[in-house]
UniProtKB/Swiss-Prot annotation:
Keywords: Chaperone, Cytoplasm, Nickel insertion. InterPro entries: UreD. UreD, UreF and UreG form a complex that acts as a GTP-hydrolysis-dependent molecular chaperone, activating the urease apoprotein by helping to assemble the nickel containing metallocenter of UreC. The UreE protein probably delivers the nickel. Required for maturation of urease via the functional incorporation of the urease nickel metallocenter. It is found in: Cytoplasm. The keyword Metal-binding does not apply. Belongs to the UreD family. GO terms for cellular component: cytoplasm. GO terms for molecular function: nickel cation binding. The lineage of its organism: Bacteria, Pseudomonadati, Pseudomonadota, Gammaproteobacteria, Alteromonadales. This is Urease accessory protein UreD. Coiled coil: none annotated. The keyword Cytoplasm applies.
């Protein structure tokens, strides 16, 4: 039986969340989504059977642009439009056996400058995918304003036969307005496990005052960073070959495959360049991963 709920989620942090603007300011928000595959006549349909929120995190109703028995598209909404000092956002998404969901956002996420107390923000995303389920995590880019301070944590937990592809794109500063990311610090942590085994563990500190930020041996002064991951390919060698054959050659991207994880990395200065690149990567890899051609979420066209 499907149980769809929009009731707020209760967290221990709730009691500490409120209208405080000093060094202890804390504004909590959370969103919990669950997807399951259900029989509908002679087909299997992915339904969103859990939807709970606390604070300003919401979700629109599911869309099925690929047909009733196709991938379930869902748009995450954060009405404030950005993250400020003291914000603590937590997103939990889980897919049970056989489900197929695509999660995206309607606009770029913004990480604003820290307040006068230097209070940091936090974002935690937990993705859990069961056997024979497929999750596509495709948010629009994140833009970090100069002086922003915070931590982004991504935890991806896959069952043995689960499949997952996704990306994260981060733009630093506002170069078009001559406002570089010159102060502040953003820490990113990635953890991907499958069947309980760690496959990809990563931590990077984006500190513009550290030599690594501009050094050729580090980030090389890149203002746009992108990571595309894929797990569950039946023929990764063919996938790598297809990427290298079909993607335009550039010093800004590279592809690797280790421990069952295919990664495409981008370091550069153009949001549109990485977006176009990652769309091409998805167009190549999605059919190999799921057997279905890539479709563009309608929200990207508005």
């Amino acid at each position: 039986m499907m149980t769809l709920s929009s009731m707020p989620v209760t967290h221990r942090a709730d009691a500490k969340s409120g209208h405080s603007f000093d060094a202890n300011r804390h504004w909590a928000a959370s969103l919990t989504l669950g997807f399951c595959a259900q029989n509908s006549g002679d087909t299997r349909v992915t339904r969103m059977n859990i939807a709970r929120h606390y604070g300003p995190l919401r979700v629109q109703r599911p869309f099925y642009p690929e047909g009733k028995d196709g991938c379930c598209h869902v748009y995450l909404l954060h009405p404030p439009g950005g993250v400020v000092s003291g914000d603590a956002l937590n997103i939990d998404i889980s897919l049970t056996k056989g489900a197929h969901s695509l999660i995206t956002t309607p606009a770029a996420n913004k990480l604003y400058k820290a307040d006068s107390n230097g209070v940091a923000w936090s974002q935690t995303t937990n993705l859990k995918v069961d056997d024979n389920a497929t999750l596509e995590w495709l948010p629009q880019e994140t833009l970090a304003f100069d002086g922003s301070r915070g931590v982004q944590v991504f935890n991806i937990e896959l069952a043995k036969t689960a499949k997952c592809l996704g990306w994260e794109i981060l733009g630093l500063g506002r170069p078009a307005s001559d406002l570089p990311f010159a102060t502040g610090c953003i820490e990113q942590r990635f953890k991907l496990t499958q069947d309980g085994k760690p496959l990809w563990l990563e931590r990077q500190n984006l500190d513009p005052t550290h030599p690594r930020f501009n050094g050729k041996w580090g980030q090389g002064g890149a203002t746009v960073h992108g990571t595309f991951w894929t797990v569950g390919l039946s023929d990764p060698t063919a996938a790598i070959a297809a990427l290298r054959e079909q993607l335009p050659p550039s010093n800004n991207w590279a592809a690797t495959y280790r421990r069952d994880v295919l990664l495409v990395r981008y370091l550069g200065h153009e949001r549109n360049q990485v977006w176009k690149l990652f769309e091409q990567v998805r167009n190549i890899l999605r059919p190999l991963l799921s057997g279905h051609q890539a479709t563009i979420p309608r929200i990207w066209l508005t």
